[in-house]
């Protein structure tokens, strides 16, 4: 079983994403059975009935088999649009609402399984941290462009750093509480950021 794909995608793109998700499912099954480190790209390709070159072409690395999805690029596109008309937090909420709808319509088990490896597998977690650093820089540039600030300004760095780090914390919390909806956890996280809280009270 593979997650549902967004209807707005073209047929060719949907076929490609479907093939990629089938490879990801095969990889997750093998990782669960044999351990992440014991499974090779070649073994994943055989299980998915594709060539190793196809796996490398689609994903590049074994870590990418876990981390790849369509949500981060979609979120950045939505944020760019929303920042034209809204302040930072409103733009984030609106962009996340749109993107999370696609995520919620996908497969809960698929996303839970992927995120468990992000949390518990050091190599995947390290690669994800690099991705978050890159996203941090992209959002900082975006926010600076829309506000007239320098992306290196402390205000920009703190705002974007708080958002990205808090989103990662929300995902980790969701992995530990799979009975919860990720959208609800993210919404609660955004409330905490926006309202602020006294660190001395924790």
Protein language model features and the residues they cover:
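Basic, helix-initiating cap at the start of DNA-binding domains
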Residues: 1-34, 38-53, 67, 74, ...
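C-terminal peripheral helix-coil segments that are non-catalytic and often amphipathic
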Residues: 1-3, 179-202
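Residue-level detection of the helix-turn-helix DNA-binding "recognition helix"
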Residues: 46, 60-61
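DNA major-groove recognition helix of helix-turn-helix
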Residues: 59, 70
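Hydrophobic alpha-helical connector segments
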Residues: 77-113
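Hydrophobic alpha-helical segments that form the core
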Residues: 110, 118, 141, 153-172, ...
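Amphipathic alpha-helical packing segments from all-alpha helical-bundle domains
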Residues: 122-147, 154-161
